[in-house]
Each structure stands twice: as structure tokens, then as C-alpha cells.
Amino acid sequence: MAAAGPGAALSPRRCDSDPASPGAQSPKDDNEDNSNDGGHPSKRRRMGSGDSSRSCETSSQDLSFSYYPAENLIEYKWPPDETGEYYMLQEQVSEYLGVTSFKRKYPDLERRDLSHKEKLYLRELNVITETQCTLGLTALRSDEVIDLMIKEYPAKHAEYSVILQEKERQRITDHYKEYSQMQQQSTQKVEASKVPEYIKKAAKKAAEFNSNLNRERMEERRAYFDLQTHVIQVPQGKYKVLPTDRTKVSSYPVALIPGQFQEYYKRYSPDELRYLPLNTALYEPPLDPELPALDSDGDSDDGEDGGGDEKRKNKGTSDSSSGNVSEGDSPPDSQEDTFQGRQKSKDKMATPRKDGSKRSVLSKSVPGYKPKVIPNALCGICLKGKESNKKGKAESLIHCSQCDNSGHPSCLDMTMELVSMIKTYPWQCMECKTCIICGQPHHEEEMMFCDVCDRGYHTFCVGLGAIPSGRWICDCCQRAPPTPRKVGRRGKNSKEG
């Protein structure tokens, strides 16, 4: 056979690894074998054409057997209660995605080692084998794995989504089958005669639910927050509407000029009519309590101190504007009290007083009132009963009308006149004392008490700038109800006596 020229085609070389062709090994292979026999470390052999063909066959076989189906990729919940989260095993995810070193390629994923209880739980679900229970397994968050599959492995994610849909469809089918079996097992039939009764029960339960819902709306969810205006909307209150005839405006509702006719007029009480000069006036004109007469000098106070009580009983008027009666022996005290009385009268003129309706309610005594009776009461100061006071003498106790406090009048430094007065109305102790005008117990530092009846008053409620010094008597005690004095008729028909 002639030698082949340079342009001739080379004959195909038989593979060295073919067992049918006993070809001699190359010198390089002999050297490597000798080196291995000599005890030197073996070197990695470069693959020839025959080795490459063998590796191709082996890799194709590995690929055919290394395919991991999406059905085997399990997502589980741990802990299995309501607080659990969904996880996947890193080993299953790496096999499904075909990533050898999954942890090195994706180090940012959140991962944790499985606990022994978690491995037993997965073993009961047939997710892992007994051999895998002894190995170290790693769990990944399922949401992070799904996001990774969507971004980098869309084909794998589509395949896995199909499997999830099939599992959900199968779950619904199984649930429907169980329900159908339960319906078949319950062969009990409803009698036609009991249908109206069942309808009534259902309507009653619906009515109860609706009533509870409406009550909850009215009591707990009345207001709501408007997202557009950022305003809390509250339902408008219901108002009583008067009939039309009660709200109809008359032809002359109010006078536009003085003396013009109007249908509005004031109704006077019989007591007020007795003071009016309508030719039938029965009482003399009363003094104005808002503008009392001022004292000219301090001597008049000293002269009137002795007979002040008798004059107040006869006239029913006060000697000072604030009701501050001075009983001091020295002239400087009386002059100081006189100056205070004048200053208080100026304050009264500048400060609007309370209306007369509130003051008219204040009376010296409550008709038919009986003080409280506590049999085994003890004095809050000496801690003794009515058998003996702090001086060892028998003395009856006085009791607060609002609490259980009691006390001896001698322990409270009360006179017999004061005790007889406080028994005529609901008396209050120092802890329960309230203002007679406003009825509030606050501002104790501005609370003062009458020396005759022990009632409490705020300084600002009676028009005083500060608590007066010395003896103070309230308007209720110093302005006794006037004794009407009848006078003769005035006018043409009046007879002169």
C-alpha cells in the first residue's frame, strides 16, 4: 500500500479503551503506571479521546439518573401550630435546581439547622428517611426559595407551580369526597311537619344576630374615621321636636321701641305683687340687699355692736355690706373692720353678684328636718361616746349628714347656740363641707364658715376678695325673713287714721 500523501485523509483511530482491540499503551501511560508502582503520589491523568468518550457516556447516564422531580420538593410548616412558618430542605432544593454547592452560591439566604423534633416530624410525613435523620439537614425559608426560583430559574418555578396547582386541586377533590361520604352516611331525613318549626328557629336566631349587631354598632362603633377628610365622624344626637303650634311666632313677639305692644310679659308671684304700688300694696318697699347703707365712721360700729342682734331681729337688715360684724373691744379693731366693710362693698358693686334665686333657696332651717341618730357613735377627737367627753362629762354627739363622723360640741369648740342651729339643717363635717352657693368642695383655702350656722361659703361665691378677719355671718343668718308690716291703703279711697 502506498504511503499516504500529506493531503490524504487519516484513518480513524481506534479507542484505546476499547476492550476488543488490544492496543499497546503509550509511553506516557507506562511512565504514570511505573510512578504509581514506585510509591510516588499519583498524578491526574490527562484524558485521551477514548477517556472522553467514556466520560461522555458516564455523564449522560448521571444526568438521566440525577433528575429530581418537582413532586419530591416538599414544603412543610414548623412548628405545625398557628405560629409556624413554611420551610424547604436545602438538600432537596439544591437537587431540584441542579446546584452542587448551594450554600456557597447563595450565602445570603436565611438558613438554620433542623432540630431533632423537626427531623422526627419530617420522618413521620415520609419527607426524609431514617438515614437522613442522622445527618445534618438545613432548612430554608420557602418564600426566599420561591423568589430565587422566579428570578434565576423560571422554568423550574413554572414546573413547581403546576405541581402545586395539582396538589391543591387534589386536596379540594378529597375534601369534597369526604363531604359526600358524610352526606351519604347521614341518612336521616327531615320530616315535612317540622319544617315550619325549623324556619321559625332560623328566623329567631337571625333576629338575635341582627339585634346584637345593631346594638354593637350603636354602643361600640358609633364613630368612624373618614380617610378622605381625616375627620372622626360622630352621629348627630336626636332632638325632641315640638309641635308646630308650640313654635309658631305670634304677630307681636317683641317690642321694637319702648312702649310698643308685645305679647311677652313677666308673671309676678303673689309675694312680689304685695310690694307693687298698685293701690293695694301690703308691704313696705324692701331695702335693696345689693346696695346696703354704708357706715359713716367707726364709732357707729362700736355703738351698734351691743344691740346688733336685737336690731337685726327687728329690722332684718345688715350693718355691713359683707356681713362682717366686728366684736372687738379696742377701737383700732373696729376701725379696721369698718374699712374692710367699705372695701368689700366696693368689690360687690364692681363684681356681679349671684342671682337672687340661689340666695332665696338658703334658709336658716329646713322644715321638718331631724338630725341623724347613731347609737354607738364615738367622738373623732377624744374617741369617747356620749357618756363622757374630754372633760369627763356626759354630752350628746353631733353627726355629719353625709358620713359617719361624729363629735362632741365641746371638742369642736361649738357654742350651744351653734349646736341648736346646726340641728335644724343637714350639717356637714370639715371633711364633707361644701359651698352652699356652688355646691363644690374644692378650693378649701378659700372656704369660710358662718359663725352662726357653720355653713361653708367660697369667698368668690359671695363676692369677697379674701377671707375676712374676725366674726363673719352669712346672708342667710343676718338677713332674717322680714316680718311684713301692713300699711294703710294709698290713694283716693284711703282713710286717714
From Swiss-Prot:
Residues 284-295 have a biased composition (Low complexity). It comes from Rattus norvegicus. Residues 296-307 have a biased composition (Acidic residues). Residues 317-327 have a biased composition (Polar residues). It is found in: Nucleus. Residues 1-61, 284-367 are annotated as: Disordered. Involved in transcription activity regulation by chromatin remodeling. Belongs to the neural progenitors-specific chromatin remodeling complex (npBAF complex) and is required for the proliferation of neural progenitors. During neural development a switch from a stem/progenitor to a post-mitotic chromatin remodeling mechanism occurs as neurons exit the cell cycle and become committed to their adult state. The transition from proliferating neural stem/progenitor cells to post-mitotic neurons requires a switch in subunit composition of the npBAF and nBAF complexes. One of its GO terms (molecular function) is zinc ion binding. PANTHER family: HL01030P-RELATED (PTHR45888), PHD FINGER PROTEIN 10 (PTHR45888:SF4). Residues 88-294 are annotated as: SAY. Belongs to the SAYP family. Residues 88-184, 291-333 are annotated as: Essential to induce neural progenitor proliferation. Residues 344-358 have a biased composition (Basic and acidic residues). The lineage of its organism: Eukaryota, Metazoa, Chordata, Craniata, Vertebrata. This is PHD finger protein 10. Component of neural progenitors-specific chromatin remodeling complex (npBAF complex) composed of at least, ARID1A/BAF250A or ARID1B/BAF250B, SMARCD1/BAF60A, SMARCD3/BAF60C, SMARCA2/BRM/BAF190B, SMARCA4/BRG1/BAF190A, SMARCB1/BAF47, SMARCC1/BAF155, SMARCE1/BAF57, SMARCC2/BAF170, PHF10/BAF45A, ACTL6A/BAF53A and actin. Interacts with ACTL6A/BAF53A, SMARCA2/BRM/BAF190B, SMARCA4/BRG1/BAF190A and PBRM1/BAF180. The modification Phosphoserine is found at S11, S35, S49, S269, S296, S300, S326, S330.
